[in-house]
Amino acid sequence: MFKKALVSTDGSAFSNKAVATAARLAQSLGAKLLLLHVRSPIETPHHVEGGALSHLGKNAVMREIEDEERKLLDAALEITAAEGIKAETAFIAGYSPYEAIIRVAREQNCDLIVMASHGRGGISGLLLGSETQKVLTHTTIPVLIVR
């Protein structure tokens, strides 16, 4: 059925549940699993200039952000390991999340995308998160949405 699934993660409880679900599915199907984290472009607002960013330096701040993102992917790897799956990880910066998810899924020949119904943005209820909705709208790859 499915041979390789991409699961996007932002470290939220919603996406951690999607990671666990994807790992169980991959385990039952004998499929590979790719964990993807996407960082949107970071813009420096004018009011931050001269503040903490200038004091610490942009490189130091970016290293801190990258360290946090590595921890986020490491936590997702722990979730997949608990389900008996050794997953691959990928990180991409500078793209909108939905575009990166679709692009990486195509480039890595994934035949399934797994996403949480909502990410860090929250808003629970009946509506899907905006990035999830955009992926559904713009891809032809099957998408499994986890609530």
Predicted regions, residues:
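Small/aliphatic-rich secondary-structure junction motif
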Residues: 3-56, 79-88
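Structural beta-alpha unit
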Residues: 78-113
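Glycine-rich, Arg-bearing micro-motifs that act as flexible, cationic patches
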Residues: 112-137
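A short acidic, glycine-rich active-site loop
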Residues: 55-71
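Aromatic/hydrophobic pocket-lining residues that form π-stacking "cages" and hydrophobic walls in ligand
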Residues: 22, 76, 101, 135
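Short hydrophobic/aromatic patches at helix-to-coil boundaries
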Residues: 143-147
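Short, hinge-like loop/turn segments at secondary-structure boundaries
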Residues: 50-54, 105-108, 131-132
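Short, well-ordered secondary-structure micro-motifs
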Residues: 18, 45-48, 99-102, 125-127
